[in-house]
Amino acid sequence: MLRRTFLAGLAGGTLSARLAAAGRTNFVFILADDFGWHDLACYGNPYFATPNLDRLAVQGARFTDAYAACPVCSPTRASILTGRYPVRTGVTDWIPGRPSHERGPITTPRTATEMKLEETTIAERLGPAGYRSASVGKWHLGNKGFWPIDQGFDENIGGNHSGSPPKSPKPYFGPFELPNLKAAEGEFLTEKLTQAAVDFIGRNRSDPFLLYLPHYTVHIPLGARGADVARHEAKANGRYNPVYAAMVESLDESVGRVLAAIDEAGIADRTIVFFFSDNGGLRYEGPAQKPVTDNSPLRAGKGHLYEGGIREPLIIRAPGVSKPGTVIDTPVSSVDFFPTMCAAAGLNAGDVDGVSLLPLLRGGSLRPRALFWHYPHYSNQGGEPGSAIREGDWKLIEWYEDGSLELYNLRDDIGEKTNLASTHRDKAERLHAQLVAWRKSVNALMPTPNPEWKPEAAATGK
């Protein structure tokens, strides 16, 4: 309620803010779904052709150590929009989550089933300053009443409660109906969302705007245009799925069309473009464990606290701010995007967990800090409940089932192959103490023993 009162007070100045907003920085945030750190050519993958994203990296800054605040989707999305860790928003697992008793010896806390209206989103922060805003694509942060329009966006195109793309009769293809987005038979979802984004840019070229473009692609069930799939089948090498590769190509095409629309509108010099993914790459699809992508050299993938589950590709093009072609290895998090946009718009970010990345983009540095994760759930991908901290080159994971610790030096061991917890006990103990103190400071909900767990049944599979 306090947030709503605050925003209502600001709304009285909206007209004057819009009149004063000419020339203000625009923001385009493109979010891929389940897209791996290694799924871009500019990140060293020779299999995928991503010329538009590679060009964006050449024109802007590419981050090597960027992280999602959670190894699954909904919590990271909330962190992007609020600048707050999942443990604070209460969205700590994908919505609606799964019953914990199905999996293991501990009962995990329930995740919130929506991003609360009391949270202040970046759209609500920018709106009173004269910004128009649209969410075009996947929302997955609650049922009706908690959709983008309820969270400060002026427009919602294609976003609802669902975490998956339309799949009937064919994944990603019409006919389907999403909020303010209808598709006839055979129309391709990624193209429809891209066109809606391009149209929004064209309508708002004279006003400052926030375009949040969270694509459904490359989330399963996989679906792509037949001609694109055929091209990739010809070069399939067993490590990558040709349908997935075709989806990556369509995502790259979308980025190219959005960049072209920015150029055509004549606003490239005052538009900051972000490209990011909500969690690590999905390695396998379905009960048959059909390969989807390969996250090497990172360990594991979506749903896991290892690097393959949380390290993401991040590209930011900020004309007049960053030197083209910059590569940044400072660890950053999805909680940092909210304060970055606020700083670029000349606004106070308020009480958030993230920090502005503008100093890094300008060639400077950030104050030393630790990054934190709290994922007290069993994931659909086999990930186990735990939490983690990264400080400098060091990363420590605590597993909630048995309290065991794993310590890695990521500079020397990006694949997390050698657990150093026993040989670097002082480092492990210090990082663990920091992690425990952080969890207490944010009132993290912790797992409890599972009374329904039967180890003998788990061992026999009965």
Explain the meaning of each model-derived region.
Residues 91-132, 139-211, 215-226, 230-245, ...:
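Formylglycine-dependent
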Residues 7, 23-25, 32, 36-37, ...:
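Long, internal low-complexity/basic segments
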Residues 1-14:
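N-terminal secretory signal peptides and thylakoid transit peptides that target proteins
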Residues 45-50, 67-72, 109-120, 183-193, ...:
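A short beta-strand-to-alpha-helix junction
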Residues 46-78, 83-88, 132-134, 154-160, ...:
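Short, structured active-site-proximal loop/turn typified by the sulfatase FGly-forming signature C/S-X-P-X-R
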Residues 147-152, 221-224, 260-321, 333:
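Histidine-centered active-site microenvironments of extracellular/periplasmic hydrolases
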Residues 155, 281-305, 322-326, 330-410, ...:
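C-terminal cap/loop subdomain of S1 sulfatases and analogous C-terminal strand-loop tails that border
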Residues 24-27, 60-64, 129-133, 154, ...:
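Loop/turn elements at helix/coil->beta-strand transitions in domains of secreted/extracellular proteins
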